[in-house]
Amino acid sequence: MTKIAEKSKQEYGDLLKEKDHLQDMEQLEMTIVSIQTPYPSIVRIQGKINTLQPELWQAPNLAIRLIVSNPPEGQPISRVYTVRSFNPINAQIEIDFVKHEDLSPAMEWLNSAQVGTKIGLIGPRPHFIPNFTAKKHVVMFADDTAVPALYSILKQWELGISADIFIESFEKDIASQLPELEHVKIHSFHKEHHTSQKGLLLKAAFALEHYENITIWAACERNEARALRQFFLEDQQLNKNDVRIAGYWRDGVSSSELDKLRAQHYQEHIQQGKTLNEYDDLDLAN
């Protein structure tokens, strides 16, 4: 590893420890109590956490950082995942992993995980939910990586709010385990494995019947997320508070490399005197 790479890795680890980044998050240990495969491409892990603040874990769309590797030299390697659910009675959380063929640090850990395995984590960090305050029709876009976020949001859905939810997935019945709610319609787009087909969510956005009195929530691949944001903010001129979009991963870029780019961008952000609450990950040019 070059000195530049070492410096970048060290700076990233330091950034994760800063007060602005940690805020009210806990640094905990999770013990796996169950491993299931609800779909061929998804592994669901249930783990018990030793939280002293269970109230922090009951909000929808919470993100955590799992310490998937602790190399003898250098910084721990971590990955961000969404908490699908939290049970306050037994302090257990559910996390879904989308399986990949490459042996990334996360997949190596997942392949070795078994009941009783312990892993460190940092969290939870609340991520955005749809803008329910104006009582507008909600339109949501998600790929496989965002289905746990969808699940947690639907479990705490605002009464009386209508929605159309578009899901792009490798699994034909991905919506079968999502809560069924009145006035909420789910549209699933099945994507074959190893296909080069892209942009299904963006095409769905282009095909909406109207763009008045709607509010947007989306989480998917970064390039598509950025295109969705541009379409709704610039082309349709929706209010920024009604366009809540996140890019969870980037096609062709490893999570390690993406984390480095995010760290550099976040460092520039805080050097300008800004805070985490003002940070928009999709402003990252790469």
Curated annotation (Swiss-Prot):
Keyword NAD among UniProt keywords: yes
EC number: 1.16.1.10
The organism's place on the tree of life at top rank: Bacteria
Protein name in the entry: Ferric acinetobactin reductase
Subunit: Monomer in solution.
Binding residue positions for FAD: R79, V80, T82, D96, V98, H100, D102, S104, A106, R250, G252, S255
Reaction it catalyzes: 2 a Fe(II)-siderophore + NAD(+) + H(+) = 2 a Fe(III)-siderophore + NADH; 2 a Fe(II)-siderophore + NADP(+) + H(+) = 2 a Fe(III)-siderophore + NADPH
Obligatory cofactor(s): FAD
Gene Ontology terms for molecular function: nucleotide binding; oxidoreductase activity
Family listed: Belongs to the SIP oxidoreductase family.
Location of the FAD-binding FR-type domain: 25-131
Pfam families: FAD_binding_9, SIP
Sorted UniProt keywords: FAD, Flavoprotein, NAD, NADP, Nucleotide-binding, Oxidoreductase
Protein source organism: Acinetobacter baumannii
Function: Ferric-siderophore reductase involved in iron removal from the siderophores after their transport into the cell. Interacts with the siderophores acinetobactin (Acb) and preacinetobactin (pre-Acb) and catalyzes the reduction of the ferric iron bound to the siderophores to ferrous iron, resulting in destabilization of the siderophore chelation complex and entrance of ferrous iron into the intracellular pool of bioavailable metals. Can use NADH and NADPH as electron donors in vitro, but the reduction rate is very slow, suggesting that NADH and NADPH are not the physiological partners of BauF.
